[in-house]
Swiss-Prot record:
GO CC, one annotated term: tRNA methyltransferase complex
Gene name per UniProt: trmB
Catalysis: reaction(s): guanosine(46) in tRNA + S-adenosyl-L-methionine = N(7)-methylguanosine(46) in tRNA + S-adenosyl-L-homocysteine
Keywords: Methyltransferase, S-adenosyl-L-methionine, Transferase, tRNA processing
Domain of life, per lineage: Bacteria
Name of the protein in question: tRNA (guanine-N(7)-)-methyltransferase
Upper taxonomic lineage: Bacteria, Pseudomonadati, Pseudomonadota, Gammaproteobacteria, Enterobacterales
EC class: transferase
HAMAP family linked: tRNA_methyltr_TrmB
Family, similarity comment: Belongs to the class I-like SAM-binding methyltransferase superfamily. TrmB family.
Organism: Sodalis glossinidius (strain morsitans)
Biological role: Catalyzes the formation of N(7)-methylguanine at position 46 (m7G46) in tRNA.
Annotated catalytic residues: 144
Residues bound to substrate: 148, 180, 217-220
């Protein structure tokens, strides 16, 4: 597998271009189990970055609705969803290798075969590899909220990114977001409300109750015990 999570970009003089990224890659230590999963399971379930569109039918060996999750962490929720919906295809993107290894190991343990994972910048994957109008669902759960005002520009939910997601979703496809930081939830709602090609699936025009399709994580359960809130937003592509 490739260990480059971003592709270098240069100007006409060959100088590296700086691009604002929504993540900081933390070099966590791989456990022996995670390394073993990467070594043995990546050939079957891993997909290396390439700057050309994927043939999703060939990737999975069948045509089926595709769910793409951005930033799946250790992969517990993603594997649970893939196991619960064998009739669907799932793609997970995560930049942290320990999480990718853990996800692969969990998928093997669960007997999941309808999941493919990538270790690369999700924006580049969407731009270069995911065909337009090919996704049924895009999931973005608990992205880094970048709490400090001077870092807000790093938040992944910005108008250009929402437009990119909109291009990749099929008509009627859904963009599902969740955050435990209320200011970020309000930011998400403001950006999504300004996107002309999305409509809210909330009966009140803002947030929705956690759908049964999104597994409750241990992190979220702990937050609930401490009285922390979680905000889910679901928007459907209209055109």
């Amino acid at each position: 597998m490739s260990n480059n999570v971003i592709s270098p970009e240069f100007d006409e003089q060959g100088r590296a271009l700086r691009r604002i990224r929504s993540f900081v890659r933390r070099q966590g230590r791989l456990t022996k189990g995670q390394q073993y999963a990467l070594d043995t399971l990546w050939p079957a379930m891993g997909t290396d970055y390439q700057a050309q569109p994927l043939d999703l039918t060939a990737l999975f060996g069948r045509a089926a609705p595709v769910t793409l999750e951005i930033g799946f962490g250790m992969g517990a929720s993603l594997v649970t969803m893939a196991a619960a919906h064998p009739e669907q295809n799932f793609i997970g993107i995560e930049v942290h290798l320990p999480g990718v290894g853990a996800c692969l190991a969990s998928a093997q343990e669960a007997g999941v075969s309808n999941l493919r994972v990538m270790c690369h910048d999700a924006v580049e994957v969407l731009e270069q590899m995911i065909p337009d109008a090919s996704l049924a669902l895009v999931q973005l759960f608990f992205p880094d909220p970048w709490h400090k005002a001077r870092h807000n520009k790093r938040r992944i939910i910005q108008a250009p990114f929402v437009e990119l997601v909109g291009r990749k979703l099929a008509a009627g496809g859904v963009f599902h977001m969740a955050t435990d930081w209320q200011p970020y939830a309000e930011h998400m709602l403001a950006v999504m409300s300004d996107a002309a090609f999305f409509r809210s699936l909330s009966s009140t025009g803002d947030y929705v109750p956690r759908p049964a399709s999104r597994p409750l994580t241990k992190f979220e359960q702990r937050g609930q015990r401490l009285g922390h809130g979680v905000w889910d937003l679901m928007f459907a592509k209209t055109v």
